[in-house]
Amino acid sequence: MRCGPLYQFLWLWPYLSYVEAVPIRKVQDDTKTLIKTIVTRINDISHTQSVSSKQRVTGLDFIPGLHPLLSLSKMDQTLAIYQQILTSLPSRNVVQISNDLENLRDLLHLLAASKSCPLPQVRALESLESLGVVLEASLYSTEVVALSRLQGSLQDMLRQLDLSPGC
């Protein structure tokens, strides 16, 4: 009877069973750091300073505004909308920001899982179906307003993370 693989497995078992979970505080700190990085990237794009995140622009109502109280699921949904908008923009300025939003959403999913509240998958939003028409009419305005509002939303999220948001 050959027990080689069994002995190897038993010998490795203590190492395999000692998997240390990433402390949730580390995930929360990484989330805050990534938010600050994205805000800095937006600040580096000079034309985003010309529009207030609270300003209303006709035809761009589908771009989320500021929310005083954000749950983790609302944060994820908001980031998904921004990510869809940014990936539709042809500007090279927003490619890295869009990638950062994907990473930020992954971190939010980890935070939600740590609270036993997995976030539902966000599907394509109907309000963004008209995005192509809006982009043809006002590409520059869409980019400026989206980045400005994203920056405001990220700053709200940063404040909410300090308050330990719910599901």
UniProtKB/Swiss-Prot annotation:
GO molecular function: hormone activity; peptide hormone receptor binding
Localization, UniProt: Secreted
InterPro entries (alphabetical): 4_helix_cytokine-like_core, Leptin
A biological process from GO: regulation of bone remodeling
N-terminal signal peptide: 1-21
GO terms under cellular component: extracellular space
UniProt xrefs under Gene3D superfamilies: 1.20.1250.10
Disulphide-bonded residues: 117-167
Short name of one Pfam family: Leptin
Main location group: secreted
Coiled coil (residue ranges): none
This protein's UniProt keywords: Disulfide bond, Obesity, Secreted, Signal
Signal found in the keyword field: yes
Similarity comment: Belongs to the leptin family.
Function: Key player in the regulation of energy balance and body weight control. Once released into the circulation, has central and peripheral effects by binding LEPR, found in many tissues, which results in the activation of several major signaling pathways. In the hypothalamus, acts as an appetite-regulating factor that induces a decrease in food intake and an increase in energy consumption by inducing anorexinogenic factors and suppressing orexigenic neuropeptides, also regulates bone mass and secretion of hypothalamo-pituitary-adrenal hormones.
Protein name as catalogued: Leptin
Organism listed in the record: Bubalus bubalis (Domestic water buffalo)
